[in-house]
Amino acid sequence: IPVGPYLKPDQLFTERQTGLGLIAAVSAYEITGEKRYLDGIKNRLGWLYQHQQHNPDGLGVDGSWRNSWQVHAGNDPPPATDIRGSSPWMTENIIDGLWHAWLATGDKRIPVMITAFGRYMERYGWIDPKVMKEAGVDWRNPCSGPNGQISWYWSSAHATTQQLVAVQSSEGWYSDSHNVEMTLPVAAARYFETDPEQQKALDRRLKQLSSSYDLDCADVSATPRRFNWNNRGVGVVQWFMQQFEAGAD
């Protein structure tokens, strides 16, 4: 996938490549201090900000890095059936990159992007148990308990519930195996969030996700790469939570 800005709705984009690319750029700058890597970070931040805040699909700002499900899945997108949305757990890679970029640059666009995605997740990213009941299917692994959380495999502010359920039933049976990973975007959004009601919502979500910190969940090998996904970027979550408890902004 070429590295660069998101310029058109049918452009191939994955949150994973974009996030890991940003992390690599930050790491290179931290190790070398070379300006070319700092310039690379600034370029990537500009691309991400433009994508999130001024998406070329013209559907407005919802807080995600909205792209095409069909292109994401390797298919040609018929405009009438394209599902404009994003992968919650792949976007964790972007949030991870943004946090490290914040530590390296203090760029003021970063809190805006992170809190916007946190709000998006609260509105569109998590599957309401009522939806599972109405669909007659529960995609969760019982290891997280009866109130275990699960994000959509493909989330959207614009798709119908029927469209999202179809993707979930086809691809998303292991979505909750990424719950530990998903604590990072929630905690990072909570760290930068200034609205008291949003802070409370994110606190509740973190508490709900804590049930996935379970040995039975850790034993599940739904995908061989799951351990890496879940644990690569979330070490800072415990630090975030200490800041919340201490009353830090």
Predicted regions and their residues:
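Glycan-recognition and catalytic cores of secretory/periplasmic carbohydrate-active enzymes
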Residues: 1-249
